Amino acid sequence: MRSGPPPRSARYRRGGLAALAAMALASGMMMTVGAPASSAAQARVDNPYEGATVYVNPDWSAKAAAEPGGEAVANEPTGVWLDRIAAIEGTDTARGLREHLDEALAQGADLIQVVIYNLPGRDCAALASNGELGPDELDRYQSEFIDPIAEIEHDSAYANLRIVNTIEIDSLPNLITNTGSRETATPECDTMKANGNYVNGVGYALGKLGGVDNVYNYIDAGHHGWIGWEDNFRPTAELIAQAANANGASPDDVAGFIANTANYSATTEPYFSIDDTVNGQKIRETTKWVDWNNYVDELTFAKDFRQALINAGLPSDIGGLIDTSRNGWGGSDRPTGPGPTTGTPDEYVDASRIDRRINPGNWCNQDGAGLGERPTASPEEGIDAYVWMKPPGESDGASEEIDNDEGKGFDRMCDPTYEGNPRNGYNPSGALPNAPISGAWFSDQFQQLVQNAYPPVS
C-alpha cells in the first residue's frame, strides 16, 4: 500500500489570474496576482498534486473560452505537449517550454504538466501521430530534444515549481501488443523492439529529466482496453521497469505512471463489473465488449497496475494519474442504471456501460464523448490525481490526408468511414468527420465534449 495517510479527495487549485484572485477574495488572503513564486527550492513530496495550484495554459484556455459553453472549463489545467523539437523553443502559434514555465510563475502556480512525446519511430502502430525522428535517430532524440528540455527544466529559476512530465505515451505498450506473431503486429513496432530505441529513449528521458527534487516523471501505461488482458498486463509492467533501469535511468527517477492518456476509457463503470453474470454466463467470457479482459474501467486497472509496477521493481510510493479529459460520456445516451438481465450478456453490458464507443480499441476523435471528471488531487488511494493531460478540443488525427510539416500521417482509424482492423475487432472507427491533424484545434469535437460532459458543465 502507499505510504503515508489515506488520501483525501480534493480539487487541486487551478492556475490563472482570475482563479487566483477569486481564491484570495474568498479566503480573505492578501496576495499579489502575478507575483513570481519563491526562488527557494521545494522539498520533494510524495504527491506533487496535493495542495498545488496547477498551471493553466493560456493558449488552450483562450481557444476553449471562445467556444460555446467553453468559458465554464477554460480555467482547467491541461498538459503542455512537446511533440517535436521546434516545440521546445515555440512556434508562431504556440509558446515554448520556457515561456510556459515563466507564465506558470507569473500565475503563482505550484505545478506545471508537460508531455514528452518525440521518440524515434514514434507511435509505431498509429500513423496519425508519427513523429519527425526516424527509427534510428536516438542520438538526435537525446541531444536535440531531451537535453534542451532538461536544461530548461533544471534552471534554478524554476526550482520552486513542481514539473510533472508524462513520458512518451503509447511507446512501451506498443512493444508488447503490436510485435512478433500477434495479428496486430506492425513492421514498424518490430523494428523499434529490435533496435531498443523505445526502451533506451524512455530510459534516457527519465534519467536526464529526473534527479532534481522538483521534477516528477510519470511513464505512460496505456489503458485498460489495451493492457488489461493477462498476456499484456504483467509484460507491460515489466517492460516499464526495464526502461526505468535503462540508459542512465534509475527507478528513483520515476514518480509514477499515467493511464488513459488521450484516450476515452471510463474512469469507473458504475452499472456493471467484471464479475457480473447474466443467466449463469460470465460477462468477461461471453461478451464482445469485455472479451476476456480483466477490467472494465480505468480506476480498477490503474490500482492493480500500480501494484504490478511495484512488484516489477519500481518504488513502493509511486502514484498513478488517470487522464479524465474526454471520458465523461454524459448526454442523453448515458445509462442511468444496469441493463436488463433477462436478455443476453451482450445486451446487458451494452445497456449498462457508460462508455458508448463501438469498441474499446477505438481511439481517434470519438463521436459521443464528453469531458470527464475535473482535475482532482488524491481521488483514490494510490492515485495522485485525475488530470486533463490531453487538452480537450485538440484533435487525435486527421480524418483524411492533410499535408503538414510535423511528420503526422493519415491513420484510417480517424476516418469515420473506416470499417476497422484487428486492433478494434474490425469494427467501425467511431471517429468524427472533418478532423484536422493531431494536436490542431477541433472546434466540433470540443463543443460535443462540453455538451456530453459528465459531471455536466455548469
Segments (PLM) and residue ranges:
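Extracytoplasmic/secreted cell-surface and envelope-processing proteins
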Residues: G90-D92, R122-A125, N174-T177, W226-E230, ...
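A solvent-exposed, charged loop/short amphipathic helix patch at secondary-structure junctions
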Residues: A126-E137, G180-K193, Y271-W292, V349-D350, ...
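Substrate-binding cleft of secreted/luminal carbohydrate-active enzymes
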Residues: Q307, N311-S458
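Substrate-binding cleft of extracellular glycoside hydrolase catalytic domains
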Residues: G90-T91, D102-D110, V114-Y218, P235-Q242, ...
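N-terminal carbohydrate-binding/catalytic regions of secreted carbohydrate-active enzymes
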Residues: R44-D155, G372, M389-P456
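Secretory targeting and sorting signals
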Residues: M1-A40
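Substrate-binding surface in catalytic domains of secreted glycosidases
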Residues: T191, G222-A243, N247, P251-G313, ...
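Structural recognition of the beta-strand scaffold that forms the well-ordered cores
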Residues: T53-V56, G79-D83, L111-I116, R162-E168, ...
